Every structure is written in structure tokens, then in C-alpha cells.
Amino acid sequence: MRITGGKAARRILKVPKGLAVRPTPDLVKQAVFNSLGGRVVGARVLELFAGTGALSLECLSRGAASAVCVEKSSRHAETLRQNFQIAGFSPEILQVRVQDVFVALAQLAVAGERFGLVLADPPYGDKNIGRRSTSFAQQLLDEVSLPQLLEPGGLLVLGHTKRDTLSVPEFWRDQKLLKHGDSVMRFLAAARDTQDAASEEIEAPFKRHEEQG
């Protein structure tokens, strides 16, 4: 696994051995960041279910201002910190929160934190034909505090398996879907942003479509 673009491109990142971790594939990361383009530059980033930190490190390499990473596993969080050192970034631009994602979301919302990008590629759920998904991806979509954490015009980029049929609550608006193999990366904006001028900046480059990998 490596950083695919920016000033730390081609740096090889560590992946914990013997642990249930599923890093976002390099081809998927490239597709995501090609779509995001200059939106990453200067952004304050929040990565949920951060694991090795691959997505937030990719953001920092491509010009993001700072990143907050939430990861429940202390062993994964230690690998994340090691990858941060490998990438050569200044320590003050990264905050690692070793805690449950949903506890962290509540605390960040109460603190009034805001982010230009929220990234999450959580562990996949089971196939859910004929019933509502119970996956982590669905739980994130259902979490009412999450859209509150987005700056005006901000985006949530959410990974899930194509077997996971998600229900998108009314406070989100789908902007784009990227597909590669079994992976889907879904771009969403808070519904409040699609009702004002900020939506124009999102919808023009992020018209909903599907790209097959």
C-alpha cells in the first residue's frame, strides 16, 4: 500500500499484520482523489474508521491543511502514527483520536468542529437484500451529527461494498458514485448545501454517475 499522489507520492505505508484491516485499494484512492481534485487543497479533513490512515495521509500529501483521524484500535492507531512519520509530515497537522467513531462524532459536534472533507471506508457489512442495512456505512449515514460537522460546501466520501444497499436519509444528497470491483465510494453533501448557492460548487463537478473499474 502506498500514497498515490502529491508530495509524499510513492511512500510505502505499513499495514498491521494478523489484524482484520482492509486498506482502501490504491486504484480506488486514485479515482477518489482524481474526482476531488483541488477541493483537497487547504481542507481540514476528518477520517473515520481510519485504520492505517491511508485516506487522510493521501489528503495531506495532496495539500490538505490538517487531519483528524478516529480509530478505535490502539494497534491500528500506532500503525497510523508510524505511517505519518514515514510520509514526513509535521506532527502538528495530525490529531489521532483512539476511541469509538460514534462517540467521537458526538464530541466533535458538541465542540463545534467543522471539516471540508469527511472520509470513511469502514469495515464492510453483510449482504442485505430484502432488509435495511445494519453496516457501519449505514450507521454513519443515519448519524444526525455527521452533516453538522461539514463546512458549507463540504463533502462526505463514504466507502461500502456494492452488496450493501444503503438507505440515504433526507439530510444527505448523493453527488457521485465511483465503483471498482466490489468497492463503492459514495460522495455526499449535506442537504442544506443543495438548497443554496453552495450547492452549485458541489453539483457542477460532482454530477452523480457511475464509473466502472
Residue spans for each PLM region:
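Class I S-adenosyl-L-methionine-dependent methyltransferase catalytic core
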Residues: 1-213
